[in-house]
Design a protein with these regions (language model features):
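ABC transporter nucleotide-binding domains
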Residues: 3, 10-198
Length: 198
C-alpha cells in the first residue's frame, strides 16, 4: 500500500472537517477525491502531506507512520496545494532550482530542464512567475511537485484556472505520471475524475 488513512478526524474549533475517515491507495493508482467545497478534501491532503499535524487517527505512507517519520515521508511526496504558493518575483527556472535545493536533488539543472519541458513551460520560461497567467502558474506548481521525482503525488484542485487546451495537456501529464506513481487529486468536478482517474 502507498497511502493508508484509518479513523482520521480533524476539527477546527467546534467545526468538524473530517469525522473518522479512512481509505487506501495502491501504488500506481490515480485516485480522485471528489466532493463539494468545504467537504474536507484539502484538509485530508494537508494531513497526508504532513502540513497539518493536529489530527486524530493514523496515517501510513509506504508502510511508515506519518507521526514517526514526517521528514522521510515529505521527501517522497510531491504536493500541489489548492493555493499554489509561488514566488512572484522569481523566474520559473530560478524557482524550480530553489525547490531542487530544498529536496537535495542530484543533477538539479538537468532535472529542472526536463520538468520544464514535461510541463510545457518553455514558451514562458523568460518570465517571472508573477507575470504568468493562472494556467501557467498552475503548471509551475505542478513542476515543483514533480521536480524531485516523488513516489506519491498529491494534487489539490490541479485543474483550476486552466483553459481547455491546458486542461487536456495537464490531464495527459497526470495520466502519464500515474503509470509510475500513486496520484491523489481533489476536485469538485465529476468530469475531471472520469477523465483522469482509474
Amino acid at each position: 500500500m502507498s497511502v493508508i488513512l484509518e479513523h482520521v478526524s480533524k476539527a477546527y474549533g467546534r467545526q468538524k472537517a473530517l469525522d473518522d475517515i479512512g481509505f487506501r491507495l495502491e501504488e500506481g493508482e490515480i485516485c480522485g477525491f471528489l466532493g463539494p467545497n468545504g467537504a474536507g478534501k484539502s484538509t485530508t491532503m494537508k494531513i497526508i502531506t504532513g502540513c497539518l499535524n493536529d489530527y486524530q487517527g493514523e496515517v501510513r505512507i509506504k508502510e511508515m507512520n506519518l507521526r514517526e517519520n514526517p521528514l522521510k515521508i515529505k521527501a517522497i511526496i510531491g504536493y500541489l496545494p489548492e493555493q499554489n504558493p509561488l514566488y512572484p518575483d522569481l523566474y520559473i527556472r530560478e524557482y524550480l532550482l530553489h525547490v531542487t535545493r530544498l529536496y537535495r536533488v542530484g543533477r538539479p539543472v538537468a532535472k529542472v530542464n526536463a520538468i520544464i519541458e514535461r510541463t510545457g513551460l518553455e514558451p514562458e520560461i523568460q518570465k517571472k512567475i508573477g507575470q504568468l497567467s493562472k494556467g501557467y502558474r498552475q503548471r509551475v506548481g505542478l513542476a515543483q511537485a514533480l521536480v524531485h521525482d516523488p513516489e506519491i503525488l498529491i494534487l489539490d484542485e490541479p485543474m483550476t484556472g486552466l483553459d481547455p487546451n491546458q486542461l487536456e495537456e495537464i490531464r495527459h501529464l497526470i495520466k502519464e505520471t500515474g503509470k509510475k506513481k500513486t496520484v491523489l487529486l481533489s476536485t469538485h468536478i465529476m468530469q475531471e475524475v472520469e477523465a483522469i482517474c482509474d
